[in-house]
Amino acid sequence: MLIAFEGIDGSGKTTQAKKLYEYLKQKGYFVSLYREPGGTKVGEVLREILLTEELDERTELLLFEASRSKLIEEKIIPDLKRDKVVILDRFVLSTIAYQGYGKGLDVEFIKNLNEFATRGVKPDITLLLDIPVDIALRRLKEKNRFENKEFLEKVRKGFLELAKEEENVVVIDASGEEEEVFKEILRALSGVLRV
């Protein structure tokens, strides 16, 4: 079972992914939690480069895909073969929304690269944590992180369009309190997992 968390920065993805990981462990599931980019030795090196270097859009895209390819090969496929529940903090929709809708790279090209990097592995369910950009920016400011409003608006729009096009995407209103959002996540998962 592969569960992907998606959403703009400040939507609460990381918090909710960790919360679900702990919850499922307590329920007796064998669970893995990985972040993108990252999750492997190579992926963490690429993450550091992506977060600290000034990169053009193409280089950035290829590094994200390289990190993803290594994570799929080294961790996700073996975990799925062992019947683990794999939780991802970001996956393919983030790349399409950020690099495609946000930065203007060709969306179809990114989808093809995603297919190549993932070897066709797809989430059983994608939880898109949707939040108005103003609320996300306020949350980010509290963590001393800053993003461009116009850019995040484009990315959010991209995520919402992808949610209509792609299979198995559930949009969750992430503007509420942490516990309310988690209850919505459990409701969404009840169709694919005994929670």
UniProtKB/Swiss-Prot annotation:
Residues bound to ATP: G7, I8, D9, G10, S11, G12, K13, T14
GO CC terms of this entry: cytoplasm; cytosol
GO molecular function, one term: ATP binding
Matching InterPro entries: P-loop_NTPase (IPR027417), Thymidylate_kin-like_dom (IPR039430), Thymidylate_kin_CS (IPR018095), Thymidylate_kinase (IPR018094)
Pfam family, one: Thymidylate_kin
Protein family according to the UniProt entry: Belongs to the thymidylate kinase family.
UniProt protein name: Thymidylate kinase
Source organism per UniProt: Aquifex aeolicus (strain VF5)
The organism's taxonomic lineage, starting at the top: Bacteria, Pseudomonadati, Aquificota, Aquificia, Aquificales
Annotated gene: tmk
